Structures are given as C-alpha cells and as structure tokens.
From Swiss-Prot:
Organism of derivation: Drosophila orena
Name of the protein in its database record: Alpha-amylase-related protein
Record carries keyword Iron-sulfur: no
Bridged cysteine pairs (disulfide): C47-C103, C156-C170, C375-C381, C417-C440, C447-C459
One GO term describing the cellular component: extracellular region
Catalytic reactions of this protein: Endohydrolysis of (1->4)-alpha-D-glucosidic linkages in polysaccharides containing three or more (1->4)-alpha-linked D-glucose units
Database matches in SMART domains: Aamy, Aamy_C
Amino acid sequence: MFKLAFTLTLCLAGSLSLAQHNPHWWGNRNTIVHLFEWKWLDIAQECENFLGPQGFAGVQVSPVNENIISAGRPWWERYQPISYKLTTRSGNEEEFGDMVRRCNDVGVRIYVDVLLNHMSGDFDGVAVGTAGTEAEPRKKSFPGVPYTAQDFHPTCEITDWNDRFQVQQCELVGLKDLNQSSDWVRSKLIEFLDHLIELGVAGFRVDAAKHMASEDLEFIYSSLSNLNIAHGFPHNSRPFIFQEVIDHGHETVSRDEYKDLGAVTEFRFSEEIGNAFRGNNALKWLQSWGTGWGFLPSGQALTFVDNHDNQRDAGAVLSYKSPKPYKMATAFHLAYPYGISRVMSSFAFDDHDTPPPQDAQERIISPEFDEDGACVNGWICEHRWRQIYAMVGFKNAVRDTEITGWWDNGDSQISFCRGNKGFLALNNNLYDLSQDLNTCLPAGTYCDVISGSLIDGSCTGKSVTVNEQGYGYIHIGSDDFDGVLALHVDAKV
C-alpha cells in the first residue's frame, strides 16, 4: 500500500511539473514581451491597441506587491518587498485586476515577476512602503504580512558562490532571506500567488530562484490553485512557471535542479547570441543553435537577447544601445525554433540605478508615441520597433515548422527556411550579401517584413520574387540599416 501511494505521489508531482511548462498561449501566438516598469492602465491599453493586434502572446509585468520607497526611486526598489498588498507605482489592485482581464480578453496572457526569496534590505529606522505599510527591515519585522525574525534565515553574507549553504540561506545583496521551509512562510507565499491566480494571471517569473532550495519551490508550486477558468483557461490548467537561475555552466547550484519544476531562464543563450552578433563568433556556427550549444531542452528554456538586469552590465550582452546587431540578434532569436521566447521593452538609462520615466512628484509617466508608433518620452519600447514586432508575426506564421535549407558563406552570412512558410537571411560581414538563395516558399512575390509592411496588398519596403523552384535573389548590403531580411507566407504581395 505504501509503495502504491508513493508511486501515485511521484506521478502527480511529475504531471504537475510538466503542466507548469505550458504558457497557455492563444492560437499560434508564441512570444512574451517584458513591459518593464509600465503602469497597469498603460499595459491594458497596450494589450488592446498593439500587443493583441500584432500577435504577442503575453506580457511579463514588474513585481506587483508593495515595495520599499528608496531615494530617487531606482527601478530595483520594486525588488524589495515590504508586504503582499497589490499597490506599487504601477497601480493598485483594482487597476491590476482590470488590466489582467482586458489583456486576457484580447488573447494576451499576464505573467507576474514574483519575489519569493526575500523581503527588503536594511533601512535606517522605520521604512514606509508604496501602500503606506511600515516595517523595520533591520529587525526583520514586516507587520504587513506579517513576518518576524523567526521567519527568516540567520543573517549572513554570500562571500563564496560555490557554497550551496551561503547561496541559498544567506542574504543576496543584503536582502532579508526568507525561510521557505517554514510552514508559515510557505502559507503566506502560496496565499499571495493564489490571489494573483484568482485575478487571472497565467503564471509567474520567479526571481532569484537559485537562492531557494528546489524542494521548497516544488512544495510551493504544487500547492498552488489551478488557473482561473473565468479568464479562459481550461479546467485543471496549472500556472506557467519560469525561474531565474543564473548558471554559466560551472555553478554549484545548477539550472538542472529547477528545469523539471518549470522553465528556466537560459542566460547562456543571451551571452552567446550577443557574442555572435557582436562579431565574436561567425554566424555559420548558429546552425546547431540550442541544445547543440549546451543549452537546456527547448521546452524548458526561457530565452532572451537581454533582460532588465544584464542589459545594465558590461560584457557581450546586446541591448537597445546597439540597435543594428540587437535587431539582427532578435530576428534570429524569433526565427530559430528554440526556446520560449521573450523580448525586452526597456526605458532609457544612463547608469545602473536610473529610474523609469517619472514626473516631478516621482510618479511613473505613461509612454507617448510618435506618428510611426515609436515611443518618445524616455521609454524605448523595443517591442514597437517594426523589425521586432514584424518578427513576432513571422514567428506566429511559421509555428510548428522546422529548420530547412540552411545556407552560409562559411562566415557570417546565413539564411534558412522554416518549412515552406518562412525565410530569414542575415549579413554580419563587412561586404554585401548578393545571392540567389532557396527560400523554400511557394512561387510569388513577398514583402520583406523587416524593411517594410504589407498594407492593402502593397509592400512599403523591399520585396522578393520567388520562382517555381523556390529561389529568390537576396541582397543585404553591408551598410544596410538592419542587416536582416525576412519573408513569410502571411506577407505575400
């Protein structure tokens, strides 16, 4: 009897973890955008006016729970919780719930960045949060939850990143480290996440997951409610989980400890795609992209060119500040069938601590748009760059097809097909790409969605004529604005 019960428990845990890899997208949609630090009302409008019509699958939103108020309002104050009240600079609970409903109604799922590892760091005296809650972080006193010192791990500093105890039980950059093995802490975290599920979210990005024991996270995830069917989720749907685990391949705490619980952020993807499109690796090597590079299996990998953290660091990672290679890397990211794709939508920053665009009263301001739909008032909005949102459409058009017809020049000019539905060419050399290439597409004329759009049957950019054999003449000059060309069956003239 015990053996049977144990077996059933294992089977249930396994089925739940598999379900937590499902992002619950509508139809053929398959790209998430991180609208970093946007207000809830603005996200609702963006879902209705842009993301839904352009075929985006979901939005990762900034942390929703009350946070400490820091001088100058740096972005990272959102990662210093003070309670689980849903009031931040992005809005209150009513506005959040309205946003989730409106986005779900147009087929755009919401994934919340959640902080389960810690509360805020030290603060002199009494700290006040964005909902007016008081706390004394130095004493580990957070009455808004409530948490007291007994709910935290003993105070210690991470000095050795190869020491599992330090990584998972000491304080990450001074943030008060919760004890997730405590029944009380578990109950409060589950209560918080379940409330968000009731409001209609599709899942969670789990911040600092590697700093929590995988067995504690497994307990928390498996205890969560199913998704809310009132928001269009099928019965018994589990929340999509993707976990921040920074693993460069030599970490004591490995990404592999978390990959069966949900998807894992594949940071090596970000680093290597940056290396390639900065010219440090020939693009020809990308033919084996994905698991051939030692990355996680596709369905377990959350992939990105940059995120809100590493875009602020020095190194190979690309960001909006290098627009041509960034757009090329993003085009490859969205065209190559590997991973669960997320694109970044940033605000301009000059240093690591730059706050989001704000007014004189330190209130976040709404993005404004020019006549072409681009953001103009401190918001970068990469997701509104034509070269990026067009590739979201490309990814939708070629869903469930494989790579065929790979071509390269032995260096950094490459092209490939996605079945007979799409074609991508890239030129990262200092000389032109001018070649008859197999597009694998049916005969006809196609609009290059990178340089223009198909409007009323006419292409506003380049077009390529494909012959009966599937070949077309492809030209990408070394000094072209974008360095990439993309064709697909939904952009046939």
